[in-house]
Curated annotation (Swiss-Prot):
Top-level taxon: Eukaryota
Single Gene Ontology MF annotation: arsenite transmembrane transporter activity
Modified residues (Phosphoserine): S286
Membrane topology reported for the UniProt record: Multi-pass membrane protein
Motif range (NPA 1): 114-116
Motif placement: NPA 2: 233-235
Pfam families: MIP
Species this protein is from: Arabidopsis thaliana (Mouse-ear cress)
Positions carrying N-acetylmethionine: M1
GO BP term, pick one: hydrogen peroxide transmembrane transport
Domain notes per entry: Aquaporins contain two tandem repeats each containing three membrane-spanning domains and a pore-forming loop with the signature motif Asn-Pro-Ala/Gly (NPA).
Keyword presence, Protease: no
Full protein name: Aquaporin NIP1-1
Amino acid sequence: MADISGNGYGNAREEVVMVNLKDEVEHQQEMEDIHNPRPLKKQDSLLSVSVPFLQKLIAEFLGTYFLVFTGCASVVVNMQNDNVVTLPGIAIVWGLTIMVLIYSLGHISGAHINPAVTIAFASCGRFPLKQVPAYVISQVIGSTLAAATLRLLFGLDHDVCSGKHDVFIGSSPVGSDLQAFTMEFIVTFYLMFIISGVATDNRAIGELAGLAIGSTVLLNVLIAAPVSSASMNPGRSLGPALVYGCYKGIWIYLVAPTLGAIAGAWVYNTVRYTDKPLREITKSGSFLKTVRIGST
């Protein structure tokens, strides 16, 4: 058999094969970069926004918009129609709205729709700190536009802060500032504690998160609305305040829910002592052991 490795044809053939292999490797690398893009460098990630992150911001904007629009619309309808909705009805509207938004947007953005929840998650390392400003801004914009929509839709009076017209869809203390602050702190603490339990703990039944959180909001509105307007959400209070220019007690609704949410998240993290599944905890529970031993 003739040796072709030393002649011109043999060398040219080897070069063609090597070039083809190189082109194929480069093509595969390009396809890999398309389907699995490499993470941006730190300095680039701060200047650019990915499409999935924009989708999350849009989800937070829409979620907060519909939350404030639906919940506050029930308040307006109740005020303008001789309390036809009633307090329990308003509480049900807020609770159901939260529930359906969690089920529809939770898989996209987490369905925070509340700056206090976003800040609380970030404080305990469950949410990227650098994404907090964008989330909060989206939520506040959604709340503000919802309040503006209601103002145009129902023709609400401009002079709502003077007390002459009792149709203000924002939040204001019914009693003293101390009562409102304390109530907002407690109900938001309770809400965030429940959120941490059903939405972040892998031992909980995640499918029931929306129902549990919505029910918590419903209960909180029932007990807190006559005292503090039951905000539990700085964005929900800030949006209407910006639209109406009415800032009475606004500091309460910015500070108390935020502190309450942070405290609720941290307290739950403190009592969350194990990562065992619920069935293992049940089997090894000291109470059940005692009962079984006593019964034998």
